[in-house]
Amino acid sequence: MSVIVDYRNVEIERAEKTVLKNVSFTLSEGEFCYLVGRVGSGKSSLMKTMYADVAIPSGEKADVLGFDLLNLKKRRIPYLRRKIGIVFQDFQLLQDRSVNENLRFVLRATGWSQRQDIEDRIEEVLTAVGMANKSYKMPHELSGGEQQRVVIARALLNKPALILADEPTGHLDPETGYQIVTLLHTLAHDGHSILMATHNLQLVDDFPARVLRCADKNLSD
C-alpha cells in the first residue's frame, strides 16, 4: 500500500506555543488509525495541519496526498482540501436545507456542474452510509447518529483518499457511536484512509486498529 501521509520531525504550534514536537509518522492507503490523547494534547491541531488550517512552523518533511505542506502555496490549499473528507463531532449541517440540499451545495461549491452527475453522486454517498431513504429530511428531523451519517456522506462526496474524523462520536450515545465507528472501519476496508481522533479508549478496545498517542507534547506510535 502506498503512503499518503508522511510527517518527519514536524513541530506543531497553536497561539505561538508548541503543542507537539518531533512528530514523525506515516499513514498508508486504506489504513484505519486512531489518534488518542487528553483534551488539549494536540490531536485537533495535528489534524488541522493536514488540511492546512494550521501552518507548520518547521519540520523535515510534511507530505499529505502528494502536497508538500512545508512549501504549500495558499492558492493550492483548496486542491488539497478537495482530496480530504473532514468529519467533526458537531455535525455543521445547514439547518435550513434538506439532506439532499446540503450535499448538493457542497458539490456545486467544489466545481460539480452537471445535474445528473450531482444527483448520482448524492445517491451513491447516501447509500454508502445507509441514508438513501432520508434524503429529503431536514437536519432537525434526524437523530444525532443520522446527522453524523450525513456528515460522513458529505465527507465522501469528492471521493477523498483520506478522511479525518475529529471526535465523530463525541455527541452520540454509546450504541450510536459504535455504529459510526463501524461505518468508518467499513470505509477503510473499501480503500479510504481514516485518521480518527478520540478520547474514548473503550472504542479503541472494541474496534482494534493502529493507535497514535499524543501526550507530553510528543506523538508515539
PLM feature spans:
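Short coil-to-helix segment of the ABC ATPase nucleotide-binding domain corresponding to the Q-loop/switch region
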Residues: 97-105
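Conserved ABC ATPase signature
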Residues: 138-142, 146-148
